Amino acid sequence: RKYCVAPLKQYTDMHDRFLLRLISKKVFLYTEMIATGSLIYGKCFDQLEFNKEEHPVGIQLGGSNVSDLVECSKKCEQFGYDEINLNVGCPSDRVQKGKFGACLMLEPNLVSECLSNMQNSVSIPVSIKCRLGIDDNEDYEFLYNFVSIVKQSGIKVFIIHARNGILKGLSPVSYTH
């Protein structure tokens, strides 16, 4: 796999992915991030839908509770996704309050444990999306240490959002309607 279309909340829905699939048969598509709590409590089933023409398509999960991630991984596999991606890149305040997204880059051992358990619970691939760094932790050593610990989980695919995640203050990119 060479090309992936990054998920973006409120943009990469099934209609967007279908259009992207018409443009390219080679790109790997992802859902927008779905929090484990939303999936467990049934608040997001409209976001889970996809058209069979979208394959290959992965689902992106947000969470940090190992048992919740395992439960959601099993549901996602049953739903027919080709891959599960753990979001360790979203810097939003709301996501941070839920203890997932980019703030998890400060907890590589927890991320590794989550990914290892997710991977052991399903037969489809599990991957990770992370940032180059977060806040002042944006040097090569920070990313190298993070990847070195997380790769012990056995995952094979790291998707790097090639920007630093800003946890304190505004993110440097803003999308307006």
Regions found by a protein language model. Name each.
Residues 56-57, 122-131:
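Short beta-strand/loop segments at the ligand-binding rim of alpha/beta enzyme cores
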Residues 61-118, 135-139:
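Active-site beta->alpha loop and helix N-cap motifs at the rims of alpha/beta catalytic domains
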Residues 176-177:
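Conserved small/polar residues in nucleotide/adenosyl-binding loops
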Residues 31, 83-91, 153-162:
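Non-cysteine beta-strand/loop elements that form the S-adenosyl-L-methionine
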Residues 8-82:
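Glycine-rich, positively charged N-terminal anion/phosphate-binding segment
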Residues 8-10, 34-36, 62-64, 89-91, ...:
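Active-site beta-loop-alpha junctions enriched in small/polar residues
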Residues 131-145:
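Active-site glycine- and acidic-residue-rich loops that bind
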Residues 1-6:
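N-terminal amphipathic alpha-helix/helix-capping segment at the start of soluble metabolic enzymes
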